[in-house]
Design a protein with these regions (language model features):
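Short, well-ordered beta-to-alpha junction loops that form the rim of enzyme active sites
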Residues: 61-64, 123, 176
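A charged nuclease-like catalytic/ligand-binding cleft shared by nucleic-acid processing domains
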Residues: 96-113, 117-130, 145-148
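Glycine-rich phosphate- or other oxyanion-binding loops that anchor nucleotides, phosphorylated ligands
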Residues: 121-172
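Single conserved hydrophobic/aromatic residue that forms the stacking wall/gate
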Residues: 174-182
């Protein structure tokens, strides 16, 4: 197994609006700018990494929600049109991304050895989520580095709306009772 090191990490905001505002050729809608603060942040990030050697970009996307295990993209290439379900008039992005399947498999296998439920996504028609695409584009608009894309497993924290409402009510009632005693 090849060994490497993590050379950088970041928490990357990824609303599709920032891709829209940049007007890349891959995105069908055209904007007149906007979202400068976030776009400038990504520009600074890219500048800070321009002399750093790295082989892949690892993205854990909160918008690729899985409920049975954590999934990893498991094919060398994914390409399609991604249309944001909430902002279809802002984000219609033609993506063509390469995946570091070897690294994804190594991470998958380590997670499996640790007892996590994991799966490799090998459906060639799988539509990659906009959070991954936005982060990939803003981080490296040339798309010349492969990605390792990891889903956000929601099974340990998924509640129905009714359960969440009940939890909020119980928490609020408990807080009010505590405040009354103080």
């Amino acid at each position: 197994m090849a060994k490497g090191e993590i050379v950088a990490g970041c928490l990357a905001p990824h609303p599709p609006h920032i891709v829209y505002a940049e007007n890349p050729s891959q995105n069908e809608p055209v904007a007149e700018g906007g979202w400068e603060q976030l776009r400038w942040g990504y520009e600074r990030l890219r500048e800070s990494l321009k002399d750093v050697e790295y082989d892949a970009i690892v993205v854990l996307s909160p918008h690729w929600q899985t409920y049975i295990g954590t999934h990893f993209l498991g094919l060398e290439n994914f390409q399609s049109l991604s249309v944001d379900p909430i902002f279809p008039n802002l984000f219609r992005y033609h993506y063509d991304m390469n995946v570091d399947v070897e690294l994804a498999t190594q991470i998958h296998d380590k997670a499996h050895e640790a007892g996590l439920a994991v799966k490799m996504m090998t459906n060639p028609d799988f539509r990659v989520d906009y959070g991954t695409i936005t982060t990939g584009h803003m981080f490296r608009p040339e798309w010349d580095k492969p990605l390792v894309v990891i889903s956000s497993n929601r099974s340990r924290a998924y509640y129905s709306v009714e359960v969440m409402q009940e939890m909020m009510t119980v928490s609020y009632t408990h807080l009010r009772a505590h405040e009354t005693r103080i």
